[in-house]
């Protein structure tokens, strides 16, 4: 598709800077939201990315009426050559995250003088309410640990099955 070179360069610059590109599948959208200041139509973004996809520069995903394009290593090299960028500049997806602060230094809650409440710590109370008892029964496993759960699954010990008609459909057979 013919498009102005300034639009193609704007699309390639944004893709190289971010490392990813998102576009809604709407060819009639007047401007792409991330390139609205440069007046680049959404159709130009979709077609430029289609061209890069056919060259193997991006990988495409589509979900919920949106295209997602991810820059590949070959694509970053191609865009670096196309935009005349030095090798020190890399897409944002290849930047290393900032150092992780240890959890002891960065707490989400402020410390108080009051001690934290003690939990049950594996002990069950002597008396459970009906709701708690139902939940407790559900959580307990009837199969001992280490047993084969798949062998235990199925119809159980019933070897004879019978079909009884319901809702007046067909003639019900008397039980045998």
Curated annotation (Swiss-Prot):
Assigned keywords, A-Z:
Ribonucleoprotein, Ribosomal protein
- What GO molecular functions are on record for this protein? RNA binding; structural constituent of ribosome
Where is the region Disordered? 104-176
Q: Which Gene3D superfamilies match?
A: Winged helix-like DNA-binding domain superfamily/Winged helix DNA-binding domain
Q: Which InterPro entries match?
A: Plectin_eS10_N, Ribosomal_eS10, WH-like_DNA-bd_sf
Q: Looking at the record's lineage, which domain of life comes first?
A: Eukaryota
Where along the chain is composition biased (Basic and acidic residues)? 108-139
- Alphabetized Pfam families for the sequence: S10_plectin
Metal-binding among keywords: no
Entry annotated with the keyword Iron: no
GO CC terms in record: cytosolic small ribosomal subunit
What sections of the sequence does the record tag as coiled-coil?
none
Family the entry assigns:
Belongs to the eukaryotic ribosomal protein eS10 family.
Name of this protein? Putative ribosomal protein eS10-like
Species per Swiss-Prot/TrEMBL record: Homo sapiens (Human)
